[in-house]
Amino acid sequence: MLDGEQKLIKDAVQGKSSAFGPLYDHYQPMIYRFVFVKVGRREDAEDITHQVFLAAWQNIGSYKHRGHPFSSWLYQIARNQVVDHYRAKKSEISLEKMDPEYFVAPATAHFDLSTKLEMEKVRVAIAGLKPDYQDVIVLRFIEDLPLKEAAHVLEKSEGAVKLMQHRAIKELQRMLEQQKN
Amino acid sequence: MFFLLLPPLAGIFLGSVNTARAADNCVITSSDLDAVTAAAAQGLMAELAARRALLTRTIACAKAEAQSLQNNLNGLSVSDDEKTIRAQLSDRLNDAMNYYDLELEKVGGAGITGTQIIAKEVFAWRGNNYNFLAAQVANFTLWVKSQNLFETALARLRSVESIVSFLEQAGAQNELRSDLASAQVLVQDARNENDSARNAFLQSLPPDQTLALIQQSLQSLSDAYQKFFDISTVVQTLLPTKP
Amino acid sequence: MNLFQILKQFKNIEPDPAFKETSRRAILAYRPVAPTTHLWSAQRTLWRIIETGAAVALTGFFVLLITGAFSGSRFVPVQYSAVDPQSLHAEAQAIDIQIQLANVTYAESAVESTVQTAGGKLLGNPKKASSTAPSAARGTTEATSTITIDQALQGLSQ
């Protein structure tokens, strides 16, 4: 959470862009990562991330603090935007048929080659999971969100999220094993 | 992918810089270089003729580019203080054009190796001298065209100060005063940074430093306007209808 | 690296700073409408009454000012246009345009081959523009491309 976040949110709800700016600066990278892991392409991730924050700013007047972090609200918007993104594409994407270049990730350009290759394999495998599994992996294992917050974002009970993350990791491991063979 | 649409003014500004890059029919293509290679296959005299022709055209284009920059520079509307800076930059562009003239004179009597040496020297000279000069001219043009923004911002600040004072007398919230104080600091910062940019031109500081100062001053202005917007939002909630 | 270690690496992915800056600017340029609050609590209702009272008082000031009921010297003439969002927006946009222009440095325009401006529209990253602009806009065929003066000099030095 950002220092003085509650005051910033209150001011942002009142329409003060000078308050929304710091919120954007703080949360944009994590929303970008969440989206990028799901969609794989930097340009798409940038477009969707932009839409997330635009939607957040346009609707900030209706935001009400209910004991959950501001980031939860942003993640929920991001999940919806990714769904809309795929709907707009209007086609079933078969991973086998995709040009590997589609998944080239300039965002990982600063990693060493072997790490980049490993990450790309894992990212492709994550992209093959169902959306809920993708979400729980990003939220719990990449962003280290507490169980309570992840449950709020995913609109599930904490128990359901615990079960889901276990299944998601198992499924991911199975897919990576399949890739290897 | 989204992109920003800029009004024609931006196009005119960038167009003037890009026109300098390919002024007055100065379009050199990769096939021009290929033609030199092809001429080499026909013999030394053919190659020499091709090299001299392309080198002459290239240096003439470089001179035309400098001339175009100078024309744009002299077309800027500047205050008396800024005329000194403009004159300095214009003189340096004259020096550049004189240099190109001297190099052009050498081309006619040069052999193949001679043309290669001239090309190499002009390339190196541009890297060490001309490119910095062109960058500084671009910076100065940008700076001159930004000056009215500072005047407008100051006028805006004065108007906002009036309305905030008026509302305070009528019992309005203190947060208006806090936002106004921030705006005042930001506008002052912007003006100080703008002055530093002017001094950077006078002191012939490196173009990247000058550009950084210009960028900082514009960012401070932009931040001041965020505060104006915040004040506007509060005032609009206090005054439900526009008079 | 095991799977969990690899997943942790994803946390180091960062968005492109130029995109972040442009996106931020575009988003903050949008002006949201002030919220209409649904007043349920007594506290909010009371605050609304106070605000309404202040608004009535201020409106009264304006009416009296306009009708000249006050002697002029004590009060500064107030221009509502000082905080008019439309004019603020126009001025802020002019500044944002200059910032964008400042970001297109001479070094960028020096290294690209074929930056074109069409009807005053800036084509984002000039490097991107030069690689994606249709060749028709450059007036060249697929086989040739326009080169810079420096590129020509380099070619001739060999």
Residue locations for each model-derived region?
Chain B
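Sec-dependent N-terminal signal peptides of Gram-positive bacterial secreted proteins and lipoproteins
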Residues: 1-21
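Generic detector of well-ordered alpha-helical segments enriched in charged/polar residues
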Residues: 56, 70, 90, 119, ...
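A cross-kingdom marker for long, charged
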Residues: 204-243
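Leu/Val/Ala/Ile-rich N-terminal alpha-helices, chiefly Sec-type signal peptides and the beginnings
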Residues: 21-125, 194, 205, 230
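Solvent-exposed, well-ordered amphipathic alpha-helical segments
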Residues: 45, 52, 59, 150, ...
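Extended amphipathic alpha-helical interaction segments
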Residues: 93-204, 238
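Amphipathic alpha-helical coiled-coil segments and their boundaries
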Residues: 37, 41-44, 48-51, 55, ...
